Amino acid sequence: MREIISIHLGQGGIQIGNACWELYCLEHGIQPDGSMPSDKAIGVEDDAFNTFFSETGAGKHVPRAVFLDLEPSVVDEVRTGTYRQLFHPEQLISGKEDAANNYARGHYTIGKEIVDLCLDRIRKLADNCTGLQGFLAFHAVGGGTGSGLGRLLLERLSVDYGKKSKLGFTIYPSPQISTAVVEPYNSVLSTHSLLEHTDVAVMLDNEAIYDICRRNLDIERPTYTNLNRLIAQVISSLTASLRFDGALNVDITEFQTNLVPYPRIHFVLSSYAPIISAEKAYHEQLSVAEITNAAFEPASMMAKCDPRHGKYMACCLMYRGDVVPKDVNASVATIKTKRTIQFVDWCPTGFKCGINYQPPTVVPGGDLAKVQRAVCMISNSTAIAEVFARIDHKFDLMYSKRAFVHWYVGEGMEEGEFSEAREDLAALEKDYEEVGAESADVEGEEDVEEY
C-alpha cells in the first residue's frame, strides 16, 4: 500500500481537517463511528481507501491522521463532535496553553514540550503502514501554532523521514482580511522553513475563497465552514487517485516531479471547477472544455494573485467523474492556443493530467451542486510572488519600527532570525523573477542558434 499520514496543526489546520475527513467518509461510505457497511473483506488492507484509513480487526476504519493544537478548545470540538468515534483518542493531541499568535511560543517555548509526544504518535501511525508514501500537513501560517509548531514539526519530520514527500496545505494571510496584527511576522518566519522542509506547498487564502463563495455560490456571508468545505473538495480531488481506481492515476510524488522545476520554487496555486450552486447547475452543461476554462480563470484561484501577471511553469489537471482522455486532450489544446495563458519558454508541454472515474461527492446540506464531472488544478506560476511581495511589504512596515518584536525575543528567539527569514524571502522573490525571465535574454552571450 501507499499510505499517507495527514497532520492537522492549529485551529485552521484542524477545522480544514474536520471538513476533509467528513468528505472522505461520505465518499467511501464510512459511517461516523468508523464502520463501513459496503466493505466485504473485513480486515483486508488491500482496498484503495486504505491509503487514508487503517482497518482494525473488528472492521472499524480509523483515519491515518493526527490533530494537534497547543490549546484544548478546538481539539475538544473534535472530541465531542459528530465524528468523535472515528478517531483514536491518542490521535487528538492538545496542550494546556495557547501559542497566542506568537510564532516564538509555537516554535520555542510551548511547542517544544508537545512536539515529542506528537512525533511519537506519528511514529505509531507510520509503523502501522506497509509502505508509507508521505505526509500531508495542514496549517495556517498567520497564527502561532500553525507557523511555529508547524515549522518545528516539519523540521523534525525531515530528520526522521528524510525521503518521504511532504505536501503542505498552507493558509496565508489575505490582503484585506486580517485575523491577527502580527500575521506578517509569523508568516515570514514560517515560510523561511517551508522553503526547506516541504516538497510542495499549496497556497490558500481566506479572502480569495470568500470571494469565490460570494460570487459563485451566492452566499452573502460565508462562514469558515463554507470555506473549509470548498478547500476539502480541492484536497479530495488531489487525493482521489490515491483512494479510488481511475484511468490516469496520479501519485503524490508525481506532483513533485511535474510541478517543481527547482527545489525552492514549489509554492503552487490551486483552483477548482465547477463551483456553482444547485440552482445554477440545473441550467448549465458543464462540459470538460468549460470546466477546464473555468479552472484557469483568475477568479477561480484560491489565493489572491493574478496568474495573468506571471507565467505558468507547469500545471496538474486532476479530473474526476465522467471524463475521457479525448476530451481532456482537446480542452488542453484549446488552453494552449489562448493568448492570456502564458507559459515560460523553457517548458513547452507544461501539462500533467489525471483522470479518476469517481464523481465528486457533495456534503448533504452543503453549498455545492452535485455534478457529473469536476476538475482541480494545481499550477506553478511566477505570479505567486505577488503573495510574498504583499506579506514582505507588511513585514517591512512593522519591522522598520521593531513593533511587537519584544514578544518574540521574550520567548527566547533571537532578533537576527527576523532579518534572516526576510532575506530568504527576498531571495525567493528574486528567484521567481529570474525563472519568469525570457531564457534567450539570459543566455545572450552564447550563440542561440545551436539547435
Curated annotation (Swiss-Prot):
- What is the similarity comment for this entry? Belongs to the tubulin family.
This enzyme's EC code(s): 3.6.5.-
Q: Which residues participate in GTP binding?
A: 11, 71, 144-145, 179, 206, 228
Q: How does it assemble?
A: Dimer of alpha and beta chains. A typical microtubule is a hollow water-filled tube with an outer diameter of 25 nm and an inner diameter of 15 nM. Alpha-beta heterodimers associate head-to-tail to form protofilaments running lengthwise along the microtubule wall with the beta-tubulin subunit facing the microtubule plus end conferring a structural polarity. Microtubules usually have 13 protofilaments but different protofilament numbers can be found in some organisms and specialized cells.
Question: Which keywords, in A-to-Z order, does the entry hold?
Answer: Acetylation, Cytoplasm, Cytoskeleton, GTP-binding, Hydrolase, Magnesium, Metal-binding, Microtubule, Nucleotide-binding
Its Gene Ontology biological processes?
A: microtubule-based process
Residue positions annotated to bind Mg(2+) are: 71
Would you tell me the protein name for this molecule?
Tubulin alpha chain
Species assigned in the record? Euglena gracilis
Q: Primary place of residence?
A: cytoplasm
Q: Gene that codes for this?
A: TUBA
Cofactors needed by this protein, per the record, are: Mg(2+)
InterPro entries for the chain: Alpha_tubulin, Beta-tubulin_BS, Tub_FtsZ_C, Tubulin, Tubulin/FtsZ-like_C, Tubulin/FtsZ_2-layer-sand-dom, Tubulin/FtsZ_GTPase_sf, Tubulin_C
Matching Gene3D superfamilies: Helix hairpin bin, Tubulin/FtsZ, C-terminal domain, Tubulin/FtsZ, GTPase domain
Where does the entry annotate site (Involved in polymerization)? Answer: 451
| Molecular function as annotated in GO | GTP binding; hydrolase activity; metal ion binding; structural constituent of cytoskeleton
Q: What does this protein do?
A: Tubulin is the major constituent of microtubules, a cylinder consisting of laterally associated linear protofilaments composed of alpha- and beta-tubulin heterodimers. Microtubules grow by the addition of GTP-tubulin dimers to the microtubule end, where a stabilizing cap forms. Below the cap, tubulin dimers are in GDP-bound state, owing to GTPase activity of alpha-tubulin.
GO CC terms of this entry: cytoplasm; microtubule
Catalytic site residues?
254
**Which CDD domains does the entry mention?**
alpha_tubulin (cd02186)
Positions carrying N6-acetyllysine? 40
Q: Where in the cell is it found?
A: Cytoplasm, Cytoskeleton
Enzyme category, top tier: hydrolase
Q: Which reaction does it catalyse?
A: GTP + H2O = GDP + phosphate + H(+)
Post-translational events: Undergoes a tyrosination/detyrosination cycle, the cyclic removal and re-addition of a C-terminal tyrosine residue by the enzymes tubulin tyrosine carboxypeptidase (TTCP) and tubulin tyrosine ligase (TTL), respectively. Acetylation of alpha chains at Lys-40 stabilizes microtubules and affects affinity and processivity of microtubule motors. This modification has a role in multiple cellular functions, ranging from cell motility, cell cycle progression or cell differentiation to intracellular trafficking and signaling.
Which Pfam families does the UniProt entry name for this protein? Tubulin (PF00091), Tubulin_C (PF03953)
